[in-house]
Amino acid sequence: MKIVRRALLMSAMAAAALAQTGPRNLDFREGAVGEEPAGWNHQPQYEARVLDTGCHKPDARCVSIEAKGNDLPPFGSFSQFVAPGDLRNQRVKFSAWVRVTEVPGCKAQLWFRTDLPDNAAGFFYNMNDRPITSPEWKLYEFVAQVQPEAVKVNFGLILLGACKVYAGDFKLEPQGILETPFVDPKLRTEDAPKVEWLKKNAIPIRTIDPADDDFADLQPLKKIIGDARVVQLGEQSHGDGATFYAKERLIRFLHEQMGFDVLAWESGFYDCEEMNQAIDSDMPALEAAQKGVFGIWTRGGLMTPLFEYARSTLKTARPLRQTGFDIQFSGSNQQGFLKVLDDLGDGIASDADKQTVRDTVRAMARTPGYKPSKEEEMAAQAAATRIAEALRKSAGSARDPRRAQFLAKSFEDFGALVHLRTQTLPSQGIRADFSFRDIKMGENLIWLANDWYKGKKIIVWAASMHVTRNAAAIDTRMDTLNYKDYRTMGQVVHESLGKAAYTITFTAYRGKSANPSTSQPPLMPPAAESVETLFHAAGMPYALVDFRGLPEGHWLRTPMIMRPLGYAQMKSDWTTNFDAVLFTDVMFPNTPAGTVPAGVKTKK
């Protein structure tokens, strides 16, 4: 997906001169049948023709887009680049009728992107999680966002594979204003005692500035966390700048004053272990981090202090080591995994197994959303398993036994990744692949704690959705989403480590969240009876409540509305899902420049 996003950005920039004042010829009525459709752009390796037969409706026109020859780019783009016009500050439903030819590997995806001033990225979505593969005409749609500051809207169709795609009746339909004034919910009279309890019992956090090392305000955490050897730090979404800052400061405190020496990321094990070498170099810290940690974090400037801090510890008696527990490739050094194959001796891997793995890695890199066939899955998994087993057997006599064990685990994860790529989406509930990925991440984290970093205390950086436990008990308050069959990483870890793992979730009252590649509207006001409204009424900019220490029957041990999971207002006895919550009154985004609001930085 990162490759497609980057390429679409470059495509849009290259086509800036072609930008129109508004969407044009969405129903293909302009121009003659059999000709190129007016107003649309595509690469020279593709041919587009207007049709009036075989379309989605008897009286409609449509377009065929077809690859020419075999020398094709990673994907084709049939698109328009327009001024926002009346779409500005609107939620916009983007839809089209699409079908693809029945050719192996043939896929299509609707895509929509907004560009902001100074070449900043706005909203982006490309159906990478649900590509179009049906030969039947079907209507596809999603709701996009055009920010008030947007300078350009880019939209169209992506083609994957050497095939022919048909499309018709593209539509851009405003669904309502994107940004509305924030109106504080009115505190209910019956909730006043709860606010008073928070004022007296919540732990005030003086600052979230990661550069501020006066940790007097964090001292209560020593008693709360106690002997836990794993502390999991969640986040509501992957664009929560204030949460990131708070986590970075917590990491410094846990490392310097509580003996936590490992930082484990929701990123690839192979990538993050290799990243350690880059951190220990002259490369800029954030650039080095991008070799291992997903770009949703490392493309933002707010993360720089953390990686510079990690670098500063490497020559000390207690360096902060970094690792990952995800089975996915996450960094910019995927070619390094291919080089590992070249370096494996004949006694470890046959040429056939090397080639099978090599072909699969390249297919994943070349085709976003690549889904192996059953035969490809079985072949790649078998090859990865044989290589992993051979590496483990040879570890005892290897020149570098730990390196051999590291590579064995990496190939084991690769086999799991191949299976993950075969997963599909249900019509309702949680994504079917989430439990598989979460279970593997949980098993990996337990392995890190009990084996790879045995005797070390570990800090976990991940989404709150992954570190939660007892997810089935969460009332999403949505008909189309439930967690009843969702086995999370946090559940796996909790069942193995129990109270040796302490989990902190985060939430916010107001503000804005966005990662470096997307822009989101400001947060909507929380419910009047929500935990966030109670915290806000208590008047603390930052505060933490320890759920573990609450007595039975406490009001926080009852179902409450809170939004730690993607800012959706869900209901649960959150004390059964997390061990603590850290509240931020005002959220701010993780921008490429790493800007923060006035007053956040307290270190002089």
What are these regions (language model features)?
Residues 10, 60-61, 228, 579:
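Short, surface-exposed beta-edge/turn micro-motifs
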Residues 11-19:
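Hydrophobic h-region of N-terminal signal peptides that target proteins for export
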Residues 2-3, 110, 244, 418:
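Short alpha-helical segments used as structural interaction elements across diverse proteins
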Residues 18-193:
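Extracellular and organelle-lumenal recognition/adhesion modules and their flexible linkers in secreted
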Residues 103, 179-604:
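Structured catalytic-domain cores with a bias toward divalent-metal coordination
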Residues 1-9:
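Bacterial N-terminal signal peptides that target proteins for export
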